[in-house]
């Protein structure tokens, strides 16, 4: 079991509650219950719910179910705009400060979990003490040869260099740029800032086991269609057609909403056999929703939990008939201790779900494994030996079809060379 709260936040007197979890698990419902109990207001952290209108396909919590609780950073971005994480950070910080100023508790809720990473984890500040780069430094940073940049980083900060593949050009370049601009090794900076939060933050993870969750998600898609989701998708398509968008332009912005791209072939009628069944589009929407939920769980376990050193409380929303006991009352008890500055008496996770946090602990240990493994058998397209970072990826490489094929080829070549030598000796 993971122990110990996350230390080092910048403002211990100001509280923030974060509710993480997959789509359709009940985050909005829980946020209303906590807001009512603790005089809170909700801040949306879902990248699709920031867009105006289309409340059904973006799954905005219905106004009539919000119990008068104010919601911030929601329903304010035009469809023509792309919404970036730096804008979310600005808007979310403004909302948090406003809510705190009025003596209330901000409750951050949403499915775009990387927003939480951007908001709560302190990042490297290169501007406060930024140095002017020399011509030589600029030449190195602008080099198109990954080896030049990587080898320079190895000399300047070997610890941070081990965390990146030599061909990970952009990240290696960024680390070297930080070193040049601050005069400080990025590895030292990251170690100092790794567990710093901007506020005293309680992380709650609302979780449901996959099978019942997926059934609820399928049912939700059916319910959305009954409530008018198809009309909203057609509304989006009308805007899409009027502005002459193409499918290739639908990788960003409002077009990422689940439902639009799944129904686009049906709306355009453009397929190989010119026939698209509405039922197939509905099934694709359900499939993509389930896939999205899987990615969200993976992100929480592999990114969020390691970032906050396991300082998170898991709530079981698997059985909705037990919602009040397993989710609502447990969340209220945890939040009450947190807000009152008392030690939290509740366990991090119910016994049946402890393994989820244990896996997060394993991930944290694995994240510290930055050993470089060089394969003497396999080479990249540029002729260099393949490099794997960390034991996990080394084992994956060793078990890959590519490695096994190269190993067999080398063995056959070695056997052939041995045969030639033996034959030559026999003849002589």
UniProtKB/Swiss-Prot annotation:
Record site: Interaction with substrate tRNA: 112, 193
Assigned GO CC terms: cytosol; mitochondrion; nucleolus; nucleus
Binding site for ATP: 21-28
Residues the entry annotates as binding dimethylallyl diphosphate: 23-28
Positions of the UniProt region annotated as Core aggregation region: 199-207
First-tier enzyme category under EC: transferase
Reaction equation(s) it catalyzes: adenosine(37) in tRNA + dimethylallyl diphosphate = N(6)-dimethylallyladenosine(37) in tRNA + diphosphate
Binding annotation for Zn(2+): 375, 378, 397, 403
Location of region: Interaction with substrate tRNA: 46-49, 170-174, 256-258, 284-302
Protein function: Catalyzes the transfer of a dimethylallyl group onto the adenine at position 37 in the anticodon loop on a specific subset of tRNAs both in the cytosol and the mitochondrion, leading to the formation of N6-(dimethylallyl)adenosine (i(6)A). This modification optimizes the codon:anticodon fit in the ribosome and promotes translational fidelity. Competes with the farnesyl pyrophosphate synthase ERG20 for the common substrate dimethylallyl diphosphate (DMAPP).
Domain observations: The core aggregation region, although lacking the prion-typical Gln/Asn (Q/N)-rich domain, is required for the formation of the amyloid-like fibrillar aggregates.
Similarity comment text for this entry: Belongs to the IPP transferase family.
Xref: PANTHER family: TRNA DIMETHYLALLYLTRANSFERASE
Misc. comment: [MOD+] is the prion form of MOD5. [MOD+] is the result of a conformational change of the cellular MOD5 protein that becomes self-propagating and infectious. This conformational change generates a form of MOD5 that assembles into amyloid-like fibrillar aggregates. [MOD+]-aggregates sequester soluble MOD5, resulting in decreased levels of (i(6)A)-modified tRNAs and higher ergosterol levels, due to less competition for ERG20, which uses the same substrate DMAPP than MOD5. [MOD+] can be cured by GdnHCl and by deletion of the molecular chaperone HSP104, which is required for [MOD+] propagation. Present with 2020 molecules/cell in log phase SD medium.
Protein's name in the database: tRNA dimethylallyltransferase
Phylogenetic classification of the source organism: Eukaryota, Fungi, Dikarya, Ascomycota, Saccharomycotina
